[in-house]
Amino acid sequence: MSNCELKPARVFEQFAEINKIPRPSKHEERMIEYLQDFGKKHGFETETDETGNVIIRKPATKGHENAPTLILQSHMDMVCDKLVDVDIDFLKDSIQTYVDGEWLKAKGTTLGADDGIGCAIELAILDSDDIEHGPLECVFTRDEETSLTGAMGMKAGFMKGDMLVNLDSEDEGQIFISCAGGKTTSAKFTFEREEAPAGYFFLKASIKGLKGGHSGDDINKKRANAIKILSRFLYMEQDKMDLRLAQFNSGKLHNAIPRDGVIVFAVPANEKETVRVDWNIFTANVEEEFHVTDTAMEFGLESTDAEAVIAKECSTRFIRCMQAIDNGVFAMCQDEALAWMVETSNNVASVITSENEINIVASQRSNVMSNLENETNTIKAVFELAGAEVKMSDGYPAWKMNPDSKLTKVAVESYKKLFGKEPIVKGIHAGLECGLFSERYPNLDMVSFGPTLRDVHTPDERLHIPTVQMVWDHLLDIMKNL
């Protein structure tokens, strides 16, 4: 089955075109050009701001000229991740997709439905001449996944609409009306390398095949974090013997739970069998701990070539730090109606070793900004106690619920009419661009919804095909009835 045979055909045709365009975060130039050409080809007012956001304005259809101007918004970039054995250049190559039952998947890579499917819905509406709607502004932001660059750089007045539908949510049947704020904390350990003591034996330990996932939406699913697992083992062995660390590399993205990692270390030759036994026991325990969430994890331990190691004093501080830093959910929402929702969390996202530095990135999220500040300071303090140089991003704000939202009421009533059931109206423990929009456009009425996606930011990302039709029908009905 090809994408063009999927329903609604016009949406999947647009998605197929989008997936021909390389669009990693911070490298959206070709996508920006495509959107500009699309708008101009259709004769619509098309504008690009200095950040690279694109807006295409479509006039109202007959009889809807007096409706409020509705903004449809999605982000044009995608997270690029792949299986270890997949050969792809995300800056040049297309995403290859296939249908598996009711799911659309990619061949060993992220699918790019986050948020390519939102872009495809917007383009399909722009391309149509048979859909009723008021004045429309279709907005495509850049670099949402790494830095929210587009939303952060957008100036007040670029969007002129009264209401906004963000098409970057991942559970059909759920209408999101608030989101978490977030910050990123980075730490750097600087060191000199030295030769390992004579007679030391080098080992390489690895882990792969973890489930991973989105560091906001999936943080409460108790999935394994490759960095924390490898850190546990290093701390355990360092406590028993003179271990010398040479390399620690795991994770790529601040908003993804790390799925694999490799460490290289040296131990006295007479301890190498102890390490092997400990590793076997340790990995068996980890497999038991995560036997529900991470069923495909694989471990490796092998001898490797000698290399210069990190200075002992720095290595010790780093390993202790990585054992001490917490990961996962810190607090659930206190409101009884939202007790199921994560309030505050931290994701230890990446550790990268270079010749004379170890760089660590951790991302904090909270729906309560004071708790976000406290959590960020807690992570910062752990790094500082370990002697690391610490930097914190400016972060992005939470999007607060608007109890008087007209758009929410219209969206809920439309859903009930179309599908005969109540949608779930909720907040999300992830950053949405709506939080930044709410700062620059304080009177903007917003909701967020989208088709069902699973395992975004991983090569297991998949799109539930039937829900695309449901979201399409829902959005068109909202536009007709505003």
Label the predicted regions.
Residues D218, N225-K228, R232-F248, M401-L444:
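Active-site-adjacent substrate-binding region
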Residues K7-V11, E343-I358, S363, F419-D477:
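Zn-dependent metallopeptidase/amidohydrolase metal-coordination segment
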Residues E102-K105, E145-T146, M152-R365:
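Midchain, well-structured core segments that form catalytic/ion-binding scaffolds
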Residues M341-K426, A430:
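Substrate-recognition/cap regions that form aromatic- and gly/pro-loop-enriched pockets
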